[in-house]
Amino acid sequence: MKALSFEAPGEAVFGTREVPVPAPGEALIHLGYNSICGSDLSLYRGVWHGFSYPVVPGHEWSGTVVEVNGPGAELVGRDVVGDLTCACGSCAACGRGTPVLCENLQELGFTRDGACAEYMTIPTGNLHVLPEGLSLRAACQVEPVAVALHAVSTVGVEPGERVAVLGAGGIGLMLMQVARQRGGVITTVGEPVAERRAVAAQLGARTVTTGRPGELAELVAKHPDLTPDVVLEASGYPVAVQEAIEVVRPGGRIGLVGYRVEEVGPMATHHVAVKALTIRGSLGPGGRFPEAIDLLARGEIEVEPLLSHEFALDDHARALDLALRRAEGNVRSFFNLRA
């Protein structure tokens, strides 16, 4: 089969390898699509956490079950998506209901081979069957929708609340749509890439900014009605977190969703105490796959504006380059794995 492997920082190798054999309790997936996440780019650059080289990247995927080793024969032939989190189920974190913090965690695309290939194995318990009418192309965005659902549920967004989103990459654009679906009013989206700002406006943001440090604070000072009740931070830059702390209303809430392990910076955290803020971190899809599938199937979340650049897997160099440079209007590169 064809597969893409990250061998070392900045080293992506395309080649052929044997089709993997599913272990007991696993399924073999004929992959359809996989989109490139910001975490994949960090993994490629070697600035991520909890990963090992070499590894086949990819965790935002869709495909078809072709074989099951053990119970689950009814899954064969079904189109599916699946949770990247392969938890042990027996450690303290799993016992607390937080498998994403599993002490023995394996993650598709980071510590076990993921979806940038023709075939992949995954525990059958991680799979979710797609309804008729939801295409494999659209379904590769189920995982990021689930991430957004988990984040919005973690921080809380109530009907009528004003929401600012910082960072309009794939996750940021999903966050704004989920917050809007929950009844939030998307007052501002900050994003340096013009084409992504345009997508945010198309999806209903009342105002968009360039993401320049201090710009959101200036906007809120001029237009107090834009002061957010909730800020969803998806860029991962410390300067953006600082701005979120400064602009959110007293008693407001901040959700930290994006992160960059290579970015550090000083922060004036006294605002958190003085304004009595609540800050919540959110990691992973949090078991929200069924809800994400339902929202996509009912057309309540738009994915086509995000799927900007399609590539065959052997054109991985260009796919990664455009995504890294955010060039040519790139919102999200994605692979058609059957091309």
Curated annotation (Swiss-Prot):
Disulfide cysteine pairs (residue numbers): none
Residues binding Zn(2+) 2: C88, C91, C94, C102
SMART domains found in the cross-reference section: PKS_ER (SM00829)
Primary enzyme class: oxidoreductase
GO MF term list: metal ion binding; oxidoreductase activity
Reaction catalyzed: 2-deoxy-scyllo-inosamine + NADP(+) = 3-amino-2,3-dideoxy-scyllo-inosose + NADPH + H(+); 2-deoxy-scyllo-inosamine + NAD(+) = 3-amino-2,3-dideoxy-scyllo-inosose + NADH + H(+)
Residues that hold Zn(2+) 1 according to the record: C37, H59, E143
Superkingdom of source: Bacteria
Biological pathway: Metabolic intermediate biosynthesis; 2-deoxystreptamine biosynthesis; 2-deoxystreptamine from D-glucose 6-phosphate: step 3/4; Antibiotic biosynthesis; tobramycin biosynthesis
Cofactor binding comment, as recorded: Binds 2 Zn(2+) ions per subunit.
The family this protein is said to belong to: Belongs to the zinc-containing alcohol dehydrogenase family. DOIA dehydrogenase subfamily.
Name of the protein this chain belongs to: 2-deoxy-scyllo-inosamine dehydrogenase
Organism: Streptoalloteichus tenebrarius (strain ATCC 17920 / DSM 40477 / JCM 4838 / CBS 697.72 / NBRC 16177 / NCIMB 11028 / NRRL B-12390 / A12253. 1 / ISP 5477) (Streptomyces tenebrarius)
